[in-house]
Amino acid sequence: MKRTMLISLVFLVAIAALFGCKQQQQAQWSQGQAGQNQVVTPPAMIKSPQEVQQLESLAKANPKNANAWIALGNAQMDAQRFAEAIVSYQRSLELDPKNVDVRVDMGTCYRGVGQPEKAVEEYRKGMKIDPRHPMAHLNAGIVLSSDLGRKSEAVKEFEKYLELAPNAPNAADIRQDIQRMKSAK
Protein backbone atom coordinates (compact mmCIF):
# COMPACT_ATOMS: atom_id res chain seq x y z
CA MET A 1 0.00 0.00 0.00
CA LYS A 2 2.80 2.43 0.93
CA ARG A 3 4.63 1.55 -2.29
CA THR A 4 1.53 2.30 -4.38
CA MET A 5 1.03 5.62 -2.61
CA LEU A 6 4.69 6.50 -3.10
CA ILE A 7 4.56 5.66 -6.81
CA SER A 8 1.39 7.74 -7.18
CA LEU A 9 2.98 10.66 -5.37
CA VAL A 10 6.13 10.51 -7.50
CA PHE A 11 3.96 10.33 -10.61
CA LEU A 12 1.89 13.35 -9.62
CA VAL A 13 4.96 15.43 -8.77
CA ALA A 14 6.64 14.52 -12.07
CA ILE A 15 3.54 15.33 -14.09
CA ALA A 16 2.94 18.59 -12.22
CA ALA A 17 6.52 19.69 -12.80
CA LEU A 18 6.53 18.78 -16.48
CA PHE A 19 3.02 19.95 -17.27
CA GLY A 20 3.41 23.17 -15.33
CA CYS A 21 6.66 24.01 -17.10
CA LYS A 22 5.19 23.24 -20.50
CA GLN A 23 2.14 25.40 -19.78
CA GLN A 24 4.38 28.28 -18.69
CA GLN A 25 6.49 27.91 -21.83
CA GLN A 26 3.40 27.81 -24.01
CA ALA A 27 2.07 30.95 -22.35
CA GLN A 28 5.34 32.74 -23.07
CA TRP A 29 5.43 31.49 -26.63
CA SER A 30 1.77 32.30 -27.24
CA GLN A 31 2.80 35.93 -26.93
CA GLY A 32 4.64 35.39 -30.19
CA GLN A 33 8.23 34.56 -29.30
CA ALA A 34 8.80 32.71 -32.53
CA GLY A 35 10.87 32.84 -35.66
CA GLN A 36 9.48 33.39 -39.11
CA ASN A 37 8.12 30.58 -41.25
CA GLN A 38 8.40 27.85 -38.68
CA VAL A 39 5.68 26.26 -36.66
CA VAL A 40 6.09 27.49 -33.14
CA THR A 41 7.26 24.88 -30.68
CA PRO A 42 8.43 25.91 -27.22
CA PRO A 43 12.11 25.19 -26.52
CA ALA A 44 12.86 21.55 -25.89
CA MET A 45 12.91 20.54 -22.25
CA ILE A 46 13.25 16.79 -22.42
CA LYS A 47 15.52 15.03 -24.83
CA SER A 48 16.94 12.00 -23.11
CA PRO A 49 15.43 8.66 -24.05
CA GLN A 50 15.43 7.69 -20.36
CA GLU A 51 13.18 10.62 -19.43
CA VAL A 52 10.79 9.83 -22.26
CA GLN A 53 10.78 6.17 -21.23
CA GLN A 54 9.94 7.12 -17.62
CA LEU A 55 7.01 9.22 -18.78
CA GLU A 56 5.87 6.39 -21.04
CA SER A 57 5.87 4.01 -18.08
CA LEU A 58 3.91 6.53 -16.00
CA ALA A 59 1.33 7.06 -18.75
CA LYS A 60 0.87 3.33 -19.29
CA ALA A 61 0.49 2.82 -15.54
CA ASN A 62 -2.20 5.54 -15.48
CA PRO A 63 -3.96 5.19 -18.84
CA LYS A 64 -6.97 7.28 -17.81
CA ASN A 65 -4.86 10.28 -16.84
CA ALA A 66 -4.96 12.79 -19.71
CA ASN A 67 -2.13 14.83 -18.18
CA ALA A 68 0.14 11.79 -18.21
CA TRP A 69 -0.42 11.36 -21.95
CA ILE A 70 0.07 15.09 -22.51
CA ALA A 71 3.37 15.05 -20.60
CA LEU A 72 4.51 12.04 -22.63
CA GLY A 73 3.44 13.67 -25.89
CA ASN A 74 5.23 16.88 -24.95
CA ALA A 75 8.42 14.97 -24.15
CA GLN A 76 8.21 13.02 -27.39
CA MET A 77 7.60 16.22 -29.35
CA ASP A 78 10.53 17.93 -27.63
CA ALA A 79 12.68 14.94 -28.63
CA GLN A 80 11.35 15.28 -32.21
CA ARG A 81 9.70 11.88 -32.01
CA PHE A 82 6.66 13.30 -33.76
CA ALA A 83 4.89 10.07 -34.78
CA GLU A 84 5.01 8.80 -31.20
CA ALA A 85 3.85 12.18 -29.88
CA ILE A 86 0.81 12.04 -32.17
CA VAL A 87 -0.22 8.71 -30.63
CA SER A 88 0.20 10.07 -27.09
CA TYR A 89 -1.73 13.24 -27.92
CA GLN A 90 -4.51 11.14 -29.45
CA ARG A 91 -4.73 9.15 -26.20
CA SER A 92 -5.01 12.39 -24.20
CA LEU A 93 -7.68 13.73 -26.56
CA GLU A 94 -9.74 10.58 -26.05
CA LEU A 95 -9.89 11.62 -22.39
CA ASP A 96 -10.07 15.40 -22.90
CA PRO A 97 -11.21 16.17 -26.47
CA LYS A 98 -11.48 19.93 -25.91
CA ASN A 99 -7.81 20.55 -25.08
CA VAL A 100 -6.78 23.14 -27.68
CA ASP A 101 -3.11 23.17 -26.64
CA VAL A 102 -2.90 19.45 -27.39
CA ARG A 103 -4.61 19.95 -30.76
CA VAL A 104 -2.08 22.65 -31.67
CA ASP A 105 0.87 20.53 -30.54
CA MET A 106 -0.50 17.55 -32.45
CA GLY A 107 -0.82 19.72 -35.55
CA THR A 108 2.82 20.68 -35.18
CA CYS A 109 3.72 16.99 -34.95
CA TYR A 110 1.74 16.23 -38.12
CA ARG A 111 3.82 18.86 -39.88
CA GLY A 112 6.92 17.21 -38.42
CA VAL A 113 6.00 13.90 -40.09
CA GLY A 114 5.29 15.57 -43.42
CA GLN A 115 1.50 15.76 -43.22
CA PRO A 116 0.73 19.49 -43.54
CA GLU A 117 -2.95 18.96 -44.43
CA LYS A 118 -3.45 17.00 -41.20
CA ALA A 119 -1.59 19.75 -39.34
CA VAL A 120 -3.99 22.41 -40.62
CA GLU A 121 -6.93 20.11 -39.83
CA GLU A 122 -5.81 19.87 -36.19
CA TYR A 123 -5.23 23.62 -35.92
CA ARG A 124 -8.74 24.21 -37.26
CA LYS A 125 -10.25 21.72 -34.83
CA GLY A 126 -8.57 23.71 -32.08
CA MET A 127 -9.95 26.96 -33.50
CA LYS A 128 -13.48 25.54 -33.40
CA ILE A 129 -13.05 24.91 -29.68
CA ASP A 130 -11.30 28.22 -28.98
CA PRO A 131 -11.34 30.72 -31.86
CA ARG A 132 -9.14 33.05 -29.79
CA HIS A 133 -6.17 30.68 -29.50
CA PRO A 134 -3.39 32.72 -31.16
CA MET A 135 -0.97 29.86 -31.74
CA ALA A 136 -3.56 27.84 -33.67
CA HIS A 137 -3.91 30.76 -36.10
CA LEU A 138 -0.18 31.48 -36.33
CA ASN A 139 0.79 27.87 -36.94
CA ALA A 140 -2.03 27.36 -39.45
CA GLY A 141 -0.83 30.45 -41.32
CA ILE A 142 2.73 29.19 -41.41
CA VAL A 143 1.78 25.74 -42.71
CA LEU A 144 -0.71 27.16 -45.22
CA SER A 145 1.90 29.58 -46.55
CA SER A 146 5.16 27.65 -46.34
CA ASP A 147 4.05 24.07 -46.92
CA LEU A 148 0.84 24.29 -48.92
CA GLY A 149 1.27 27.53 -50.87
CA ARG A 150 -2.24 28.68 -49.94
CA LYS A 151 -1.29 32.31 -49.40
CA SER A 152 -4.78 33.86 -49.21
CA GLU A 153 -5.80 31.44 -46.45
CA ALA A 154 -2.49 32.06 -44.70
CA VAL A 155 -3.06 35.83 -44.76
CA LYS A 156 -6.42 35.37 -43.00
CA GLU A 157 -4.83 33.24 -40.30
CA PHE A 158 -1.95 35.68 -39.81
CA GLU A 159 -4.37 38.60 -39.59
CA LYS A 160 -6.40 36.77 -36.95
CA TYR A 161 -3.19 36.02 -35.04
CA LEU A 162 -2.27 39.72 -35.07
CA GLU A 163 -5.77 40.62 -33.91
CA LEU A 164 -5.32 38.27 -30.94
CA ALA A 165 -1.66 39.11 -30.22
CA PRO A 166 -1.07 42.61 -31.67
CA ASN A 167 1.99 43.30 -29.54
CA ALA A 168 3.68 39.94 -30.00
CA PRO A 169 7.44 40.19 -30.53
CA ASN A 170 7.05 38.68 -34.00
CA ALA A 171 4.15 40.97 -34.99
CA ALA A 172 6.28 43.19 -37.25
CA ASP A 173 7.66 40.15 -39.09
CA ILE A 174 4.17 38.73 -39.54
CA ARG A 175 2.91 42.08 -40.87
CA GLN A 176 5.77 42.09 -43.41
CA ASP A 177 4.91 38.54 -44.45
CA ILE A 178 1.28 39.55 -44.95
CA GLN A 179 2.31 42.51 -47.11
CA ARG A 180 4.63 40.30 -49.19
CA MET A 181 1.88 37.75 -49.77
CA LYS A 182 -0.69 40.41 -50.66
CA SER A 183 1.65 42.17 -53.08
CA ALA A 184 2.58 38.87 -54.77
CA LYS A 185 -0.99 38.36 -55.97
Language model feature labels by segment:
Residues 74, 108, 142-143, 180:
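Residue-level recognition of tetratricopeptide repeat
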Residues 58, 91-92, 125-126, 160-161:
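Canonical positions in the second alpha-helix
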Residues 71, 105, 139, 174-177:
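Canonical tetratricopeptide repeat
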Residues 61, 95, 129, 164-167:
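Structural marker of alpha-solenoid helical repeat scaffolds
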Residues 66-67, 100-101, 134-135, 169:
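Helix-start (N-cap) detector for alpha-helical repeat units in TPR-like alpha-solenoids
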Residues 46, 80, 114, 148-149:
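Residue-level detector of the short coil/turn that links helix A to helix B
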Residues 77, 104, 108-111, 145-146:
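Position-specific recognition of the canonical hydrophobic site in helix A of tetratricopeptide repeat
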